[in-house]
Design a protein with these regions (language model features):
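Hydrophobic/aromatic beta-strand patches that form the interior of the parallel beta-sheet core
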Residues: 51, 81, 105-107, 132, ...
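A short acidic, amphipathic alpha-helical/loop segment
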Residues: 65-69, 93, 118, 142-146, ...
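A contiguous pocket-lining binding segment that forms or flanks enzyme active sites
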Residues: 123-168
Length: 228
């Protein structure tokens, strides 16, 4: 058999180079942002694995970042389970992103332990499509419990955490979000593949669906279900 040129071998889909995004055949859900999907293994949010989204404070665009995926999954009948958010989500804003309010569950907790428990149970449930808990100081062993809970599931575990969160984490993907004028900067801290040196600037507001129709339709949707 004739030897193949080295470049031909290196360009084979089964070969991964350390300076490129990992080519992995893993389940994923598109983020809704082509620039971000292009640099994520699998082309979207990893399903069945933890993703951490870090920010210096709530309201830096972290929730808007996951709205396209949340809309896709709630429209298919899966639950969006919001665990211990720092503020009550504005229902018309969710609708403007295409989220079905009838598939949104708001879980109120009294402690970090309750938040972790609620997150773990949600990740074990195959009815939940997107589980974004707001977690503060969470030890690595607790994160590993969450990773174990989501294994074998195709849900998205998108953990919102403060920017000072410890670097040691079992999460397959870690992002940091910050504001820059009218755009949101997304910096990849960890992924399967090489690092991304420059942040990606995203226009989160450009993903809103037509405001008039969907927002008006919010009155006809069921209210967000709350669980205490």
């Amino acid at each position: 058999m004739a030897a193949q040129p080295l470049e031909t071998v290196l360009n084979h889909p089964a070969v991964w180079r350390g300076n490129e995004c990992a080519r992995v055949a893993v389940p994923s859900v598109p983020t809704g942002f082509a620039e971000l999907d292009a640099v994520l293994p699998g082309g979207g949010w990893p399903a069945g694995a933890l993703t951490e989204i870090l920010s210096e404070r709530p309201g830096m665009g972290e929730l808007q970042l996951v709205m396209p995926a949340a809309a896709r999954l709630t429209q298919s009948g899966r639950w969006l389970t919001l665990i211990a958010p720092p503020y009550i989500p504005y229902a018309p804003a969710l609708v403007s992103h295409g989220v079905h309010l009838s598939r949104v569950m708001l879980v109120k907790t009294a402690s970090a332990e309750e938040s972790l428990w609620a997150c773990e149970q949600s990740l074990r449930s195959h009815g939940c499509g997107v589980v974004p808990p707001w977690l503060d100081r969470t030890p690595e062993r607790s994160l590993r419990r969450l990773q174990h809970a989501i294994e074998g599931n195709d849900a998205l575990a998108l953990l919102f955490r403060p920017g000072r969160a410890i670097p040691a984490s079992p999460a397959a993907l870690r992002l940091h979000v910050s504001k820059s004028q009218s755009r949101t900067l997304v910096r990849i801290l960890k992924r399967r593949g090489s690092d991304i040196p420059a942040p990606i600037a995203l226009d989160l507001h450009g993903k809103l669906v037509g405001r008039t129709g969907p927002v008006r339709a919010a009155a006809n949707q069921l209210p967000i279900e709350e669980v205490a």
